[in-house]
Amino acid sequence: MSEVSGLPINRNPLSPGIPALRSGPRGLFDLLPLSVVLPAAAAGAAAGTAAVALHAQLWVSLAIGFGIALLGTIKIEQTNIWQILGMRIALRWRNRRGSAIQPAAAAFDVPVPESGGVHCGMRWDGRYMITMLEVGQATVAPTLLGPAQIRTDDAVPLTEAARCLSQFDIRLAAIDVVTQGVRTQGDQEVVRIYEQLLGPLPASAARTVRLALRFDPLDNTEAIDNRGGGDEGTIRTALVATRRVVSRLATDGVRVRMLTAAELTAADADALYDTAPQDWTEQWHTVRNDAVEMSGYTVRSGRLTSELLAGIWAVPGLSTLVRLRLTPVARSAGPGRAADEVAVTALVRHDTNATMPGDRPEMPAELGLRRLTGRQRRILLDGGHIDPATASSGPPAALARLAVPAAGSGQVIGATSDGFGVAVPLFGPAVRRVEIVGQLRLTQLMVLRAIAVGAKVIVHSTRPDAWSHLAAEVGEPTALSVSSPGGGAQHAAAATMIVYDGVGSAGQVAEATVLHVRAPGEVSAAVPGADVVLVESATDPHEVTIRTARGVLTVRAVTIPEESRYLDAAPDSVPQPA
């Protein structure tokens, strides 16, 4: 039976009082914009005139002209035939002449007054000044996962972010909420087995969330003049706007920090796997290099929901990136006046291994996504804007309907009695110490799944034979290696998880999570100071209690037969003190 004690996971996050997001306006000029109608009419008139000049009958000339005009107004995936032909020709031209992408402007640091030496990184992106914030994990806690559902209280408050668009005397052009995450890491067999275990669960083991603030000096001339004018006034105004966003989110309990110039540059490079934009080749549906293939999608108008945002993370791949761009509706906001309407567009980028044989995983059609055909480079690499017709809009409060987790879910531990999968991080920067109290099988199962989500594990144990079997089955020394008690210091430097099984730890290793294995019954010795504690029931080995700073949650451990091959042949024994 599932038991929750002091664990404030919101199982029904939507209140009836939350306003709904609406699809963009769909008037006549939205359905048939002049940019489509006029060229189509001109093409139809030219075709009809040519038919008359060739002595065709009048009704034939009219039919030809009308048919050509109609053909030009019909849209396929929000694009008419003339746009498709134009994009095809432009794509061939770009690929023939090679990439001519201008390098991004260099980022620079601005000292933050009265902050003890903190710097804020800034860079220009065309007419916009960009600053960036990184969202930190508040506390380590379980995440509940269901098909197209992610339940966590550690989420980005989009409503508060939207209210930061229009400040006292400053207006931001946009706030991009950018989430990049991975389900699994590596190509070992344990990764494929873990994917089978996950099935349709939207489990993103690791997730980085950043907020990119876009400041338009032309829209804030008065505020800039009040702060000295020119470049200095522009920088001061952008810094003030950034600090106000940090302060407002911190008031809401969100840990955010400003990125320095070096970190801003590194974040941009990390999004492209440390490559330059010119290293990528554009195709009709993708951009790719020798190792990675990236596919871009937009969300159809009216389809943006928390269920869709969760379902995106259920698709296997190298990584997934989601960008929610919040912009004030032009008619409703200005400096000093709160925006009563906010527009939001969604970009989804799904990355796969370009060297993978056969068909690669794709976003399922039922999610309601639309491919960025012919526009992959402009949007994925150049940061171009998405068609405003795909935007949803509403008051800032309506964004409470969209759940954006602030951190990764970690690895799956088990399931609740009402069918939710339960995941919790067992390694990473926010997890310094983990305690597992129970049989060896439970610990090895958790280590196996940690490897599937990217952990590099070194084990110090008084029962090395039991661990050597698992290491041999994994078959990847960089992922799992076993050291004799007190040895293996040379391996610990590269490890992200160090397991001490019957061996006293040598102190905290930088960047590595320490996992202590305790014999059944050692509950009292395991609790103090640990970020996560897993306690196996003494009467039911399938029942595991998860303890974190947020509370206690008891779940049923879930395994699949493929995992048993790694675990069943391992000899079990009680760890002996070193």
Name these PLM-found stretches.
Residues 71-160, 166, 408, 412-413:
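N-terminal topogenic membrane-targeting module
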Residues 476-508:
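Conserved P-loop NTPase "ATPase switch" module shared by AAA+ and STAND
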Residues 160, 172-175:
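Membrane-embedded segments
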Residues 174-182, 256-263:
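Short, glycine/acidic-rich hinge or "gate" loops at secondary-structure transitions
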Residues 195-472, 487-491, 503, 513, ...:
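Membrane-proximal, solvent-exposed terminal domains/tails of membrane-associated proteins
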